[in-house]
Amino acid sequence: MPLNAAMVGTSAEPVVHTIDARWLMAYAAGLGETLPCYLDTRRPEGLQAHPLFPVCVEWLAVLGMRDHAGAFGLTAEEALRTVHATHDLVLHRGVRPGDTLTTRATVVGVEQRKPGAFQWCALRC
C-alpha cells in the first residue's frame, strides 16, 4: 500500500459537533464509569466529559481523510484496510455540555515502515 508524500498538508473538511449531556453520559456509561462527574446532571459543577471522549469528535474527521485517498494513489479498498496504530491526545481544557467543537484532520507526515506505509494525521479541535 503506497502512500504519496504529496499528501502531506492535505486536510479533510472540518467536522462540527455540538456536545450535549446525553452524549457525554452515554460515552461514560459505555466505558462502565460510575463517577458522578460523568453521570450526575444535578451536580452544581455540571457534567464533565471523560478524558477519552474527544475520540468521538475526532473519528469523523479521520474518516473524512479517506475521501482524499484516491488522489494520492490509494484504492478505495486499500483505504478501508488502514489500521489506526497509535493515538496521542493533548487536552487543553475539559469538554462540557453545550460546547461546539470543530475538528480538522491534516496529514503531517508519511513514511515507509517494515509493515507498510505509515501516515501521521494531526487532529485539532
Regions of interest found by a model, annotated:
Residues 1-84:
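Hot-dog-fold acyl-thioester-processing enzymes
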Residues 82-125:
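Hydrophobic beta-sheet segments that form the core/acyl-binding groove
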